Regions:
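Secretory targeting signatures
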Residues: 1-26
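Cyclophilin-like peptidyl-prolyl cis-trans isomerases
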Residues: 22-222
Length: 222
């Protein structure tokens, strides 16, 4: 488990807002209220740097769920606490199993108060372990932090439109391909070595991307 030398924790709360046109739309009667909230993608300016060859991931798709990741961290022992929001679009259109898993965990409150337990500069920041919560004073945490989950796994899901571009959200897993649970990560710079075509172990599944707040991701990673 890797942590930056002076990081004092990253706590977050996720809430969902559906991607739509700039006008609000009505939700279906059997859908949660957040499905009726419209967003304007033009307001998102702090984006990842994405190669033009991956234009399909640069486009926002109407109807996809969007996560607001509220982060709070202290870069150094003498620095003031930084608070911000990272906006992430979930590609429900291309990764329905993985995004549905994420949405269910968000709605259940599984991630509330969890911190990033693995931080590697110029690679990934990883979170999603429900046991990774502060016990007493940070960085004191549950001894199982980093290896926890819900115990319910999902199959490895790939789509040709998705790859590990800068700011991609991917599903963490164990040695077995179909062992994804609740842990996920965000890439800090392109990490195509995690894509299935570049590995002999099945690779890792991408299911979302940062749309705003990438500066916070980079600060946490560094």
């Amino acid at each position: 488990m890797l942590r930056p030398p002076f990081a004092l924790g990253v706590l977050f709360l996720l809430a969902m807002l559906p991607l739509a046109s700039s006008v609000q739309v009505d939700a279906q009667n059997d859908e949660p209220a957040w499905r009726s909230v419209g967003l304007d993608p033009d307001l998102w300016t702090d984006r990842p740097v994405i190669n033009e060859s991956r234009t399909q991931m640069m486009v926002s798709y109407q109807g996809n769920a969007v996560i607001e990741l509220n982060v709070s961290y202290q870069p150094g022992l003498v620095d003031e606490r930084v608070e911000g929001t990272v906006v992430i679009e979930l590609f429900e259109n291309w990764a329905p199993i993985t995004t549905n898993n994420m949405i269910n965990h968000v709605e259940s409150g599984l991630y509330d108060g969890v911190f990033f337990h693995r931080v590697v500069d110029n690679f990934v920041t990883q979170a999603g372990d429900p046991t990774c919560k502060t016990v007493g004073i940070y960085p004191a945490a549950n001894p199982s932090c980093g290896s926890g989950g819900t115990g319910e796994t999902i199959p490895l899901e790939h789509n040709d439109n998705l790859s590990h571009v800068d700011g991609a959200m991917g599903m963490a897993r164990g040695a077995e391909e179909d062992s994804g649970d609740s842990q996920w990560y965000i890439t800090d710079t392109e990490q195509h070595g995690l894509d299935p075509e570049n590995r002999d172990d099945g690779g890792y599944a991408v299911f979302g991307i940062v749309r705003d707040g990438m500066t916070f991701v980079r600060e946490i990673a560094s």
